[in-house]
């Protein structure tokens, strides 16, 4: 093995700085959650690519709009939260059920061993966000929808929601550790996986995150996979299997955005 040199250190610093510059450019130019956009905007991203063009065409038979999320590793949790709250704005009884579940979630996490002082601020902010998008709030649906969009583009609120959903996901993995251990490749324990891949911000999500969160909150999600797979059609997967989806997401390698059915 060649000895470490000063140049190696400089190169590492340069790589780290380049990564920071890219992250800053993304945060400066990309909103946390975009406005609704026509699904056809995807064509421009894959111009000249026959496989993706055919799949976007297939997708457009089922969906009319897309809402982008910032590609920062938190996209699944942010997209999930925005889309589910958007659904709840129009469904008062489902909203009340979710609000009750959210209120009780902190105590459940404490019983699972999460320190109460760690949860306090995140849970408080989570409940504030839920209250601010209540279907009963003054101004009607469009006013509440505007409030939801405003909240999710305020970094503090938006990130606190993501953190709390990560904690709920981690709690579900701990609660049903024997079941979820089957989804983890390699020698990682559930505890190590939770601390390394679930609780930290900016860590990307996989099927295990989706299943755990959907199960914890009783919310069905349909994910449409836009990839290079054969067939010319987009494959969909419902989480949990057999559930009725309330949230529709599109997955492209490493990233989730929100979809709106026709």
From Swiss-Prot:
Annotated active site residues, numbered on this chain, are: 72, 75, 255
Which Pfam families does the UniProt record give?
Peptidase_C65 (PF10275)
Please provide the Gene Ontology terms (biological process) for this protein.
positive regulation of peptidoglycan recognition protein signaling pathway; protein deubiquitination; proteolysis
Task: Provide any one GO MF term from the record.
Answer: ubiquitin binding
> What CDD domains does the entry give?
OTUB1 (cd22763)
UniProt keyword terms in alphabetical order: Hydrolase, Protease, Thiol protease, Ubl conjugation pathway
Q: Mind telling me which Gene3D superfamilies this protein's record contains?
A: Peptidase C65 Otubain, subdomain 1 (3.30.200.60), Peptidase C65 Otubain, subdomain 2 (1.20.1300.20)
Catalyzed reactions: Thiol-dependent hydrolysis of ester, thioester, amide, peptide and isopeptide bonds formed by the C-terminal Gly of ubiquitin (a 76-residue protein attached to proteins as an intracellular targeting signal)
Q: What is its EC number?
A: 3.4.19.12
Q: Where does substrate bind?
A: 168
Provide the OTU domain boundaries.
Answer: 64-262
Q: Which SUPFAM superfamilies did the record assign?
A: Cysteine proteinases
- UniProt-listed InterPro entries: OTU_dom, Otubain, Papain-like_cys_pep_sf, Peptidase_C65_otubain, Peptidase_C65_otubain_sub1, Peptidase_C65_otubain_sub2
Q: What does this protein do?
A: Possible hydrolase that can remove conjugated ubiquitin from proteins in vitro and may therefore play an important regulatory role at the level of protein turnover by preventing degradation.
* Protein family: Belongs to the peptidase C65 family.
Can you name this protein? Ubiquitin thioesterase otubain-like
Q: Which organism is it from?
A: Drosophila melanogaster (Fruit fly)
